[in-house]
Swiss-Prot record:
Belongs to the EF-Ts family. PANTHER family: ELONGATION FACTOR TS, ELONGATION FACTOR TS, MITOCHONDRIAL. One of its GO terms (cellular component) is cytoplasm. This is Elongation factor Ts. It comes from Bacillus cytotoxicus (strain DSM 22905 / CIP 110041 / 391-98 / NVH 391-98). Gene3D superfamilies: 1.10.286.20, DNA helicase RuvA subunit, C-terminal domain, Elongation factor Ts, dimerisation domain. The keyword Protein biosynthesis applies.
């Protein structure tokens, strides 16, 4: 298949590899993005790609807690300017309170719910769109629960660009739970611990690391041992409890949580716009479009 400049750009953003290396990888793998990433890693050219590191939309994340329930949501706008608008921020808080109180199962169900004065949630959002003048989208939300013996940790980074809610079992130390949430915001683990990683993902990583070691010219008899050592680093990158704690790198997150008498039950991390492709206008075209719109 034809390898486009956009494909090369995307692979560069995902791996940090050079343009020609990315083009070669895509050509060798017939345009398959995931296989091209593996190709670059096996050659030692790129690190593992982060699946959700492309922040391309605007908006806010927000967390609402009440008793033993917490809600995290993401509300998208088209521009950062609107995300800082008081009306948009008020809408975010209103929606969070409504969703936590009414507990819809899906975004579709949430939009169809009655809000106030006979209007639905979707109609309420549409009224805000009319006032603010920009498309606003309720992208996602999740409700988590705990018991009286547990603690929520809620953390919003950069005014809501990243939101994290954690649940610690066996302790009511909210400060500790928030510290873990801050760590999750900064390091972005995928899983709580190694047990949560699928056998398929581990085997895939083992194969990539094995090929990488062989390509480095390592003797076959020591490759297996090397791979197991590198797998340990792989787990440290993706598993929360295996990571060095950001507030005290001399201890693991597991040790920090255990020192508080708790265990991590779960976490949810939202970064605004992750995984969303934003249309990129040529600046000159954008200006012309605005001029035409004013005629």
């Amino acid at each position: 298949m034809a390898i486009t400049a956009q494909m090369v750009k995307e692979l560069r953003e995902k791996t940090g590899a050079g343009m020609m290396d990315c083009k070669k990888a895509l050509t060798e793998m017939n345009g398959d993005m995931e296989k091209a990433i593996d190709f670059l890693r096996e050659k030692g050219i790129a690190k593992a790609a982060k699946k959700a590191d492309r922040i391309a939309a605007e908006g806010l994340t927000y967390i609402e807690t009440k008793g033993n329930e917490a809600l995290i949501l993401e509300l998208n706008s088209e521009t950062d300017f609107v995300a800082k608008n008081e009306g948009f921020q008020a809408l975010t808080k209103e929606l969070a309170a409504h969703l936590l109180a009414n507990k819809p199962a899906t975004v579709e169900e949430a939009l169809a719910q009655s809000y106030e004065n006979g209007k639905t949630v979707e109609e309420h959002i549409n009224e805000a769109i009319a006032k603010i003048g920009e498309k606003i989208t309720l992208r996602r939300f999740e409700i988590v629960s705990k018991t009286d013996a547990d603690a929520f940790g809620a953390y919003l980074h950069m005014g809501g660009r990243i939101g994290v809610v954690t649940v610690l079992e066996g302790t009511t130390d909210e400060e500790a739970a928030k510290d873990v949430a801050m760590h999750v915001a900064a390091v972005n683990p995928k899983y709580i611990d190694r047990d949560a990683v699928t056998a398929e993902e581990v085997e895939h990583e083992r194969q990539v690391l094995t090929q990488q070691a062989l390509n480095e010219g390592k003797p076959e008899k020591i490759v297996a041992k090397m791979v197991e050592g590198r797998l340990g680093k792989f787990f440290e990158e993706i598993c929360l409890l295996d990571q060095a704690f950001v507030k005290n790198p001399d201890m693991k997150v597991r040790q920090f949580v255990e020192s508080k008498g708790g265990t991590v039950k779960g976490f949810v991390r939202y970064a605004v716009g992750e995984g969303i492709e934003k249309r990129e206008d040529n600046f000159a075209e954008e200006v012309m479009n605005q001029v035409k719109g004013n005629n």
